């Protein structure tokens, strides 16, 4: 007896994928990947764009705020480290230039 190929259940829509701006992303859907594509060079994400999860609960908002605080702290720390390194190399460069002038 021949085996039958099962069809997808009726009434169910295929999975839809959306890009960062909430638009249906046909290219992503074609590949079957759930991850959004990076914005192209002529696109940029702005505050006017709709949020990805407009109904985020209080736990999600708290998580996002804490993450933003940690990232801000890390950025400030890295900025200080870079500024310190720049000052260090400027001092070394001045010393080397002075030594060059004395030779």
From Swiss-Prot:
Region annotation (Disordered) ranges: 1-64
Role played: Contributes to multiple aspects of the viral life cycle including viral genome amplification, suppression of suprabasal cell differentiation and egress of newly formed virions. Induces host cell cycle arrest at the G2 phase by associating with and preventing the nuclear entry of host CDK1/cyclin B1 complexes. Inhibits cellular DNA replication by preventing loading of host replication licensing proteins MCM2 and MCM7 onto chromatin. Within the cytoplasm, associates with host kinase SRPK1, a splicing factor regulator, and inhibits its activity.
UniProt GO BP: symbiont-mediated arrest of host cell cycle during G2/M transition
SUBUNIT field: Assembles into oligomeric complexes. Interacts with host CDK1. Interacts with host SRPK1; this interaction may favor expression of late viral transcripts. Interacts with host cytokeratin components KRT8 and KRT18.
The keyword Phosphoprotein is assigned to this record: yes
UniProt protein name: Protein E4
Keywords: Early protein, Host cytoplasm, Host G2/M cell cycle arrest by virus, Host nucleus, Host-virus interaction, Modulation of host cell cycle by virus, Phosphoprotein
An example Gene Ontology CC term for this record: host cell nucleus
Main location: host cell
UniProt PTM comment: Phosphorylated by host ERK. The phosphorylation triggers a structural change that enhances keratin binding and protein stability.
Species of origin: Human papillomavirus type 41
Compositional bias annotation for Basic and acidic residues: 10-30
Family membership: Belongs to the papillomaviridae E4 protein family.
Additional facts recorded: The major E4 form is first synthesized as an E1^E4 fusion protein from spliced E1^E4 transcripts, such that the first few amino acids of the E4 protein are derived from the N terminus of E1.
Gene that this sequence comes from: E4
Entry annotated with the keyword Phosphoprotein: yes
Subcellular location: Host cytoplasm; Host nucleus
